[in-house]
Structure formats: structure tokens, C-alpha cells
Amino acid sequence: MDVDYQLAFNLAPVGLCLSRNRAIVACNQQLCEMFGASRELLIGQSFQVLYPSADEYERLGARMAPILNARGHYADDRIMKRANGEVFWCHVTGRALNRAAPHEAGIWAFEDLSAQRP
């Protein structure tokens, strides 16, 4: 069976993105819909645009790095921000492609928890 990984990425039921140095280099349609932004708007942007504040972006980045170093993956529930400014609870899980440099490159999944955690 041939697997079309690009199609699977694009049609996944959760938001997916690939990152380099905490910037979005690829994302699927579900991520765009979740955050209310187009792919063109998100590609090349720092993850900071998805956080409620720059401080929260920095705080979580510092908290994740040692965990990604040790385990290679990270997950939590956190408040994120849509393009229209609305904040919402989101389950985020990701994997560093290089544990020695955890923010260098990664794959991340985002699940909107609004229905469970308004």
C-alpha cells in the first residue's frame, strides 16, 4: 500500500506543523482553521503569534527546552490565541528532531480543547 504522507499531513484531524527555530515552516489546514489564519499568513511566522503574550511564549520555550533535551518530546495543555485575539485551551504535543538542539526543528500537533475546557 502506497502512503501519501503529504495528504495524511494535510487531512489530519488535528492541527499539525513543522518548525525550525520556533518558526512555522509548514502547517496543515486544520491548524489554519483552529487559529483562524491562512497558511500564507502562518508560514514563516514565529510561534509567538499563537501565544497570548510574548512573555508566555518565552516562558514556555524556556520550560520546554530541558524536557525536549531529556525526552525528545513534550506535551501540555495551554492557552493559545487565535488570529482574531480570542484565547482558547489547546493540547500541544511535539517532538524535537534533534534533542541536543530542541528548538532547531520539530513536529507539533495542536488540539482545540474549547469544547471540553471553555
Placement of each model-derived feature along the sequence:
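Sensory modules in modular signal-transduction proteins
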Residues: 1-20, 25, 29
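PAS-associated C-terminal cap
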Residues: 1-4, 111-118
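Terminal output helix/cap of sensory domains in signal transduction proteins
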Residues: 54-86
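PAS-family sensory domains
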Residues: 25-27, 33, 51
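Sensory beta-sandwich core in regulatory modules of signaling proteins
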Residues: 80, 108-109
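PAS-family sensory/regulatory domains
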Residues: 41-54
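Short loop/turn elements at sensory-signaling interfaces that couple input to output
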Residues: 19, 92-107
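PAS/PAS-like sensory domain cap-loop motif
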Residues: 31-43
